[in-house]
Amino acid sequence: MLTRGDKGQAVVELQEQLVALGYALPRWGADGDLGNETLSALTKFLADHGRGDEEPYVVAAAELELVHQVYAATAAACPVPVPGRTFYDLRKESDRSNIHGRRPWTQITGITLHQCAVDFGHEKPARWDSLWAQTAASLEGDFFLVHDLQALVWHGHGFNPTDVGLELEGLYAGIAGPPDGSATPQTPTPELIATAQGGIRWIYEQVKRHGGQLRYLHAHRQSRDSRRADPGQELWQAIAIPMMAELGLTDGGLGFKIGSGRAIPEEWNPQYVGSAY
């Protein structure tokens, strides 16, 4: 049972499930504080399911259970499958010091793609739990949920407040071709590409189901000049460009960048004629 004024994770869960079921909380969102907005949304939910609300300032155990049951049935019908050969939920094990707060679902408007610039090795989930991003995909085709999508994680500089970070395992050249440094770049595996694309679909659907809307697919280079090769030409062309076309997303267009970032170059997207690497 919950009472008006209660705070905590149980309230957040109730609020998120109400929003996912179409009962918007436009003023306060899932803030973890059981106030009049959430109680009014619950009253509407109960009415739609043939229940009265005899105690409008109390959420009875039976009412909570009904919300959970309806939400579970809706979630089970989600048309987008969980991405990856194996889906690793590392949220309980991940480094909490990488989380710097939470944001409402409506604030999540994009995904930032990153290259890890390292090969973590074959299927070692424990090595991913310190990642500075919410999600990741491995060369073998595994997907990692490292932090809640609502978690505020320092992964993309100016994109931190609005974007989910998606790390892609491996070291990749900024422009495909002979290496320009001491390290030899890798080639993206088909498993990595497929899992990253599935991950983008899954993140898109999760945000939508919770009342938000993704509009952008960014490269880390767009927010930081020192990330010039992030995520790199091959990953951008194999993952970002097809997914933008499929989901109606944008990278901001020709010349778009924020802060000290660099725009998407012509080498990554031939439509951006004259945009320098």
Feature names for model-found ranges:
Residues 2-71, 215:
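Short acidic, glycine/serine/threonine-rich helix-capping segments at coil-helix boundaries
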Residues 10, 69-160, 276:
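N-terminal catalytic cores of peptidoglycan-degrading enzymes
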Residues 14, 157-175:
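Short coil-to-beta-strand
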Residues 22, 46, 117, 170-172:
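Short, histidine-centered active-site or binding-site loop motifs used for metal coordination
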Residues 47, 53-94, 100, 105, ...:
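Basic/polar, cationic surfaces and motifs that engage anionic cell-wall
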Residues 110, 163-165, 216-218:
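Structural preference for beta-strand elements that scaffold enzyme active sites
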Residues 115, 168, 219-221:
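A cross-domain feature marking catalytic cores of carbohydrate-active enzymes
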Residues 119, 172-174, 225:
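Feature marks short, surface-exposed loop/turn motifs that line or immediately flank catalytic pockets
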